[in-house]
């Protein structure tokens, strides 16, 4: 996962970390990042394909009220690289999602 690189400078989604995103330690729960990333893809994608592999590299923590911006590169052949930044600059996590035919 550390080799995941995202070149895109255009955000595909922006959201603010809410109460339901926060774990008992006051951080955004790691599962919520995965859910936000999976929400980037249209429902049709899930009807036609399945996720073969999902890699995640956590880099930093984020907290209630942080603005999370998601960037995505389509690497081709069903491979997507995603990066989440908080408050416009610091990378929180990177992910590689690989889809395959059902």
Which functions belong to the PLM regions below?
Residues 12-14, 53, 94-96:
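Well-ordered beta-strand positions in beta-sheet-rich domains
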Residues 1, 62-64, 73-102:
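HotDog/MaoC-like acyl-thioester-processing domains
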Residues 1-50:
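Hot-dog-fold acyl-thioester-processing enzymes
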